[in-house]
Amino acid sequence: MSAVLAPTVRIQRQDFDVAAEIAALTQGRADVGAVVSFSGLCRDEQGALSALELEHYPGMAEAEIGRIAAEAVERWPLQGLTVIHRHGKIRPGENIVLVVAASAHRQAAFEAANFLMDYLKSRAPFWKKEHRTDGSEGGWVEAKETDTQAAKRWKSSSE
């Protein structure tokens, strides 16, 4: 019987190194045949954003993301899973989120990473506030309907 994979979930203020996180997940592993990573960056679409401030309720965010990461491990045959989400003020071009899924085969890794990102974009307990280059504060950013719809494709028939 194989050991149950414990996903790595971190909520942190500091930046992360994508290559280092992938290396940490795959170092010395001969059972991994595919690694899919998604790194989400802070984007400034109109040239007016100085920072995006992400707030979370400590404990709740880790528990919720841990729950969905555990569901990914149950649904797909993964050899490794890392989810990192930052909080605090994040400037355009900086990392916000990282999902790294490792599996023996690519389909499981791709699907698990997609599943996690759809969840993170629509239901993870983070609140985002825009800070503009003119010194003003923008509004709180809501989840997009397209993100909510994307997450619905993963619901099981029992939900």
Curated annotation (Swiss-Prot):
Q: What is its EC number?
A: 2.8.1.12
Query: Which pathway is recorded for this entry?
Result: Cofactor biosynthesis; molybdopterin biosynthesis
Q: Identify the keywords attached in UniProt to this record, alphabetized.
A: Molybdenum cofactor biosynthesis, Transferase
GO terms of molecular function: molybdopterin synthase activity
The reply on keyword Transmembrane is no
Chain intervals for the UniProt region annotation (Disordered): 130-159
Q: Where does substrate bind?
A: L41, C42, R43, H105, R106, K121, K128, K129, E130
Q: Which domain of life is it from?
A: Bacteria
Which biological process annotations from GO are given for this protein?
A: Mo-molybdopterin cofactor biosynthetic process
Q: Which reaction does it catalyse?
A: 2 [molybdopterin-synthase sulfur-carrier protein]-C-terminal-Gly-aminoethanethioate + cyclic pyranopterin phosphate + H2O = molybdopterin + 2 [molybdopterin-synthase sulfur-carrier protein]-C-terminal Gly-Gly + 2 H(+)
Family the UniProt entry places it in: Belongs to the MoaE family.
PANTHER family membership: MOLYBDOPTERIN SYNTHASE RELATED
Quaternary assembly? Heterotetramer of 2 MoaD subunits and 2 MoaE subunits. Also stable as homodimer. The enzyme changes between these two forms during catalysis.
Summary of the function given for this chain in its UniProt record: Converts molybdopterin precursor Z into molybdopterin. This requires the incorporation of two sulfur atoms into precursor Z to generate a dithiolene group. The sulfur is provided by MoaD.
Name of protein: Molybdopterin synthase catalytic subunit
The organism named in the record is: Mesorhizobium japonicum (strain LMG 29417 / CECT 9101 / MAFF 303099) (Mesorhizobium loti (strain MAFF 303099))
